[in-house]
Amino acid sequence: MLLFLEMEPEYVKQAFRDLFNEEKSVDGRMDRFVFYCDELLRMYRERHPHSIENNHYHGNDYDMISLYLTFRYPADYAPYSLERLISLLRKLGVGNLPQANDPVRYFKVMRTLFKLMQKEDGIQARHQERLTGSSYYQGESLLLAHDFACFITDDRYAERGLCRPYPGK
């Protein structure tokens, strides 16, 4: 993305402005962002045909796009993974599993989990315990629901550092 920003700063800014426009549907914004990135990669390849960076972009990677949304709107979005969504829905006993990427459904599930978790007194306090110091975002964030989803779906997420363990664990 930094190479794209260096190459076409206004185009990249427009891509992010569109992605962060909450007046439009999130699935449409994410799909348009994929289109913007495809175009940027096409331009980059034309200008730098022998660059190793030509193979770095991973197509319609909603995972990375969701991370941009999470950083911009932490109370509304969480890092997306189709694998995590399917595993989470299985663990929750949901029968209608997605057959393809469905970040909109994932965000809805995260918001629902977060609301349920907020009703449990000890969970929020325990979460705040691990966010010591000024380097951690202190506002409302779906990352609590994301951590829960990681915890109940796959221990590999914690091992790779994508889910931060609670103190004393």
State each model region's role:
Residues 1-58, 74-169:
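An N-terminal alpha-helical hairpin/helix-loop-helix interaction module that forms a charged
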Residues 65-69:
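Cytochrome P450 catalytic-core helices
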